[in-house]
Amino acid sequence: MKLYSLSVLYKGENKVHLLKSAYDVSSFSFFQRSSIQEFMAFTSQLIVERSDKGSRSSVKEQEYLCHVYVRNDSLAGVVIADNEYPPRVCFTLLEKVLEEFSTQVDRIDWPSGSPATIQYNALDSYLSKYQNPRDADPMSKVQAELDETKIILHNTMESLLQRGEKLDDLVSKSEVLGTQSKAFYKTARKQNSCCDIM
């Protein structure tokens, strides 16, 4: 999972222009980096130009996803990531960046601003912080912990059973379980196996 670009743009009546951007092109060849960076800036502008105000969307191009959020006040943000990166985290990042940008940079500067004139330097830190979505996003962290717990529980159950033993055999031999509990287990097992086939 990787983020390559984070940009803030202004969608004017006739033209979209870049206000500020940050790039991580370290995974590309040294000689390709400037061309890739230019292409990402061009793609970001094109996507914002073709998006409606007040919209969020994702555009797939080969193994990359471009996530765009255009606010009603014409301020827009674009994140370019690989297709494994969670879209929800991208839109959370865009919302956070655009909100912070709109409070730190005067609205009057947006239509005429450029990367050289806009005083906002947080994009690089956001781009590096959000490289790992689990660290940056609390929901992703909770989901990862739940997945780990599920794996641990599954492994623990398998390790409790002795070699060659099956849970089905243990249930049928059990003296503690009543016949109704055994019947419930068998019915549940059949229903679950039915669902696995589909």
Curated annotation (Swiss-Prot):
Vesicular soluble NSF attachment protein receptor (v-SNARE) mediating vesicle docking and fusion to a specific acceptor cellular compartment. Functions in endoplasmic reticulum to Golgi transport; as part of a SNARE complex composed of GOSR1, GOSR2 and STX5. Functions in early/recycling endosome to TGN transport; as part of a SNARE complex composed of BET1L, GOSR1 and STX5. Has a S-palmitoyl transferase activity. This is Synaptobrevin homolog YKT6-A. Belongs to the synaptobrevin family. Residues 196-198 form a propeptide. It is a lipid-anchor. It comes from Xenopus laevis (African clawed frog). Keywords: Coiled coil, Cytoplasm, Cytoplasmic vesicle, ER-Golgi transport, Golgi apparatus, Lipoprotein, Membrane, Methylation, Palmitate, Prenylation, Protein transport, Transferase, Transport. PANTHER family: SYNAPTOBREVIN HOMOLOG YKT6. Its main location: cytoplasm. It is found in: Cytoplasm, Cytosol; Cytoplasmic vesicle membrane; Golgi apparatus membrane.
